[in-house]
């Protein structure tokens, strides 16, 4: 056979790119066993067998020439491992008595719970059997279920007694090595005398493998029929115990296979992350489906970022400059500004529109258009009330310095229908505005509805030779303007909003007046008490005690050292808090001018009282120049 290569399917062992591999076949090889060893060395595998691509099994002892007709190979592992893993079970005991137990019962296993040796056993100190347990079992959990040996010594003893205890598991048999077999052969004549059952014969494949292999492993001596019987019996009696004892073995096998896979990945320089992602994404399927499907890996960049690092998102900001679209000049609405403005405009006035046209009129002389005679005002008190009411009917139109009433404007327009000129009006002069008699002529004597009567209008002259124009206005055609009462409060005579009061009838003589000045009387008694207490006072260096009399000064503004200090205040300590250093003082006397400053130091809840509150709550550091009164003995 010449040198060649062949495709090998390793999907039973790997889920990544190694599941389809190409293997070199050397012509110097004799049988299939050499090819199996070569694949095991390449991929760090153990106990594999080969099949052809059409499903034909290749025995290990078969010649290598059979591969000429094969298109491809597939590697797998037997579930039972009859030829490599197992040793024949221990010989059956011949007696049911406890004292005649065989030596095989003292084999110690590597289990999760310690196995206690039998107390009545004669061979407790047999070190040869205990050292065998150092070799851990390499059998998987699935393989243990399939490779059940014949009935063991312990299982027959328990079934004969009728107890529900579980028989010896397959892990006990799997731990026996070739040394056990040789020792069993030496002790065979002794066991034959005691046992009544027959030994199971070796299989031909197992015997050939023992002769050829340099370091043979355990050999199975049970037939297929006995294996099936023991398997069904073990599944009925104790499946849970079997899974628990074999759990440790399967974990060791899985960890070794993972280490082998990692070393192989490092040698081939394949990233570990890619292999783990692809292996996790794919589901275990049949060999044909697994070979046809492609591995798909999903990646999320957000999941790869550290979770504890904050992410800052920057959004573009649009800055718009402020644009001035329109300028508006607001004029004051306060009546006091209007009066000042009207007083300054003695000789100038603005035109007002009429019928949608602006025209100018230049009268040449001053003339009173219409003046109604009103009864004289006799009472001077009504004069002061008339002054307040005269300014009240100012409306929003007065802002433009037009003071003509609607009735008067209509009368003037009707008088000049033939001409294209109009009259121009202004506010009365400053002298006329301050004259109370002229202002009150526009009001009736008993007018209580705050309605204004027609007012006299004046025409500004531009030429001295202008003819006088008179406009007779009927009282029925004049529309009165109602002034709300609340507008009286907005009108004042000065910039300081001080109302004008007529005090001409007040008697200034102090003899007949009831108003008398009150002399300020200084409280000398409190000063005398404090002066007497200072004679026997000593500086206060620590917290006073309850009942002590103290003299101290306080800041005029609490907490402000630059505000200055008050005069001395005398008081008696009623409570002292040693922890917060706050002293409650009941005042004895203090200067009357600092009574308002003491409100800052009043106790909470007492500052709103109408009584003379004298209890203060003061911190020790707020007592300035504090002194304590020492009682003297006469």
Curated annotation (Swiss-Prot):
Component of nuclear coiled bodies, also known as Cajal bodies or CBs, which are involved in the modification and assembly of nucleoplasmic snRNPs. Required for Cajal body formation. Signal peptide: none annotated. It is found in: Nucleus; Nucleus, Nucleoplasm; Nucleus, Cajal body; Chromosome, Centromere. The keyword Transit peptide does not apply. Residues 87-135, 149-276, 342-361 are annotated as: Disordered. Residues 223-234, 251-272 have a biased composition (Basic and acidic residues). Keywords: Centromere, Chromosome, Cytoplasm, Cytoskeleton, Nucleus. Its main location: nucleus. One of its GO terms (biological process) is Cajal body organization. Disruption phenotype: Viable and fertile with no obvious phenotype. Loss of Cajal bodies (CBs) in the nurse cells, spermatocytes, ejaculatory ducts. Loss of CBs in the adult Malpighian tubule cells. Histone locus bodies (HLBs) in the same cell types are present and not affected. In stage 8-9 oocytes, the single CB present in the germinal vesicle is unaffected. The lineage of its organism: Eukaryota, Metazoa, Ecdysozoa, Arthropoda, Hexapoda. It comes from the Eukaryota. In egg chambers expressed in the follicle cells, nurse cells and oocyte. Expressed in the larval brain, salivary glands, fat bodies and in the somatic hub cells at the tip of the testis. Expressed in the spermatogonia and spermatocytes, and in the adult ejaculatory duct (at protein level). Expressed in the adult Malpighian tubules. InterPro entries: Coilin_N (IPR031722). The gene is coil. GO terms for molecular function: molecular condensate scaffold activity. It holds the Pfam family Coilin_N. This is Coilin.
């Amino acid at each position: 056979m010449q040198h060649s290569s062949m495709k090998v399917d390793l999907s039973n062992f790997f889920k990544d790119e190694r599941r389809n591999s190409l293997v070199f076949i050397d012509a110097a090889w004799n049988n299939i066993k050499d090819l199996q060893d070569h694949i095991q060395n390449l991929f760090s595998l153990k106990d594999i067998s080969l099949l052809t691509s059409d499903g034909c099994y290749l025995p290990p002892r078969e010649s290598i020439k059979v591969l000429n007709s094969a298109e491809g190979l597939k590697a797998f592992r037997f579930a039972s491992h009859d030829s490599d893993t197992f040793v024949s079970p221990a010989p059956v005991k011949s007696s049911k008595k406890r004292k005649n137990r065989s030596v095989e019962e003292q084999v110690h296993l590597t289990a999760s719970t310690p196995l206690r040796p039998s107390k009545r056993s004669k061979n407790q100190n047999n070190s040869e059997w205990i050292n065998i347990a150092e070799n851990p079992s390499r059998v998987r959990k699935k393989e243990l279920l399939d490779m059940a040996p014949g009935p063991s010594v312990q299982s027959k003893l328990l079934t004969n007694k009728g107890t529900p205890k579980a028989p010896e598991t397959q892990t006990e048999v799997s731990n026996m090595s070739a040394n056990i077999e040789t020792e069993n052969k030496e002790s065979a004549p002794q066991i034959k005398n005691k046992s009544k059952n027959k030994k199971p014969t070796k299989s031909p494949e197992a015997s050939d493998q023992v002769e050829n292999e340099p370091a043979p492993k355990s050999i199975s001596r049970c037939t297929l029929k006995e294996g099936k019987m023991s398997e069904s019996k073990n599944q009925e009696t104790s499946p849970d115990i079997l899974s628990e004892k074999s759990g440790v073995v399967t974990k060791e096998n899985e960890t070794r296979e993972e280490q082998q896979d990692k070393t192989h990945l490092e040698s081939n320089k394949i990233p570990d992350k890619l292999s783990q992602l692809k292996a996790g994404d794919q589901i275990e399927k049949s060999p044909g489906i697994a070979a046809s499907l492609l591995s798909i890996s999903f990646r999320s960049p957000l999941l790869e970022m550290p979770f504890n690092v904050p992410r800052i998102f920057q959004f573009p900001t649009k800055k718009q400059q402020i644009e001035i679209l329109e300028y508006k000049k607001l004029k004051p609405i306060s009546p006091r500004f209007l009066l000042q403005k009207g007083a300054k405009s003695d000789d100038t006035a603005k035109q007002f529109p009429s019928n949608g046209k602006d025209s100018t009129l230049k009268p040449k002389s001053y003339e009173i258009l219409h003046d109604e005679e009103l009864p004289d005002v006799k009472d001077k008190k009504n004069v002061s009330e008339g002054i307040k009411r005269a300014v009240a009917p100012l409306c929003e139109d007065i802002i433009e310095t037009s003071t003509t009433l609607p009735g008067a404007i209509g009368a003037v327009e009707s008088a000049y229908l033939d001409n294209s000129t109009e009259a121009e009006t202004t506010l009365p002069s400053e002298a006329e505005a301050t004259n109370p008699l002229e202002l009150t002529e526009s009001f009736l004597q008993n007018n209580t509805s705050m309605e204004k009567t027609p007012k006299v209008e004046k025409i500004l002259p531009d030429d001295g030779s202008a003819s006088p124009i008179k406009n007779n206005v009927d009282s029925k055609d004049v529309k009165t303007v109602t002034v709300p009462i609340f507008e009286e409060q907005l009108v004042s005579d000065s910039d300081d909003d001080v109302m004008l009061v007529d005090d001409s009838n007040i008697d200034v003589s102090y003899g007949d007046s009831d108003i008398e000045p009150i002399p300020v009387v200084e409280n000398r008694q409190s000063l005398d008490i404090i002066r007497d207490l200072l004679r026997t006072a000593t500086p206060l260096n620590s917290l006073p005690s309850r009942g002590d009399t103290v003299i101290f000064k306080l800041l005029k503004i609490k907490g402000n050292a630059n505000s200055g200090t008050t005069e001395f205040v005398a008081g008696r300590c009623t409570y002292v808090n040693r922890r917060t250093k706050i002293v409650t003082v009941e005042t004895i006397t203090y200067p009357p001018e600092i009574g308002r400053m003491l409100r800052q130091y009043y106790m909470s809840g007492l500052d709103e009282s109408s009584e003379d509150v004298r209890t203060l709550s003061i911190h020790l550091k707020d007592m300035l120049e504090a002194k304590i009164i020492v009682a003297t003995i006469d």
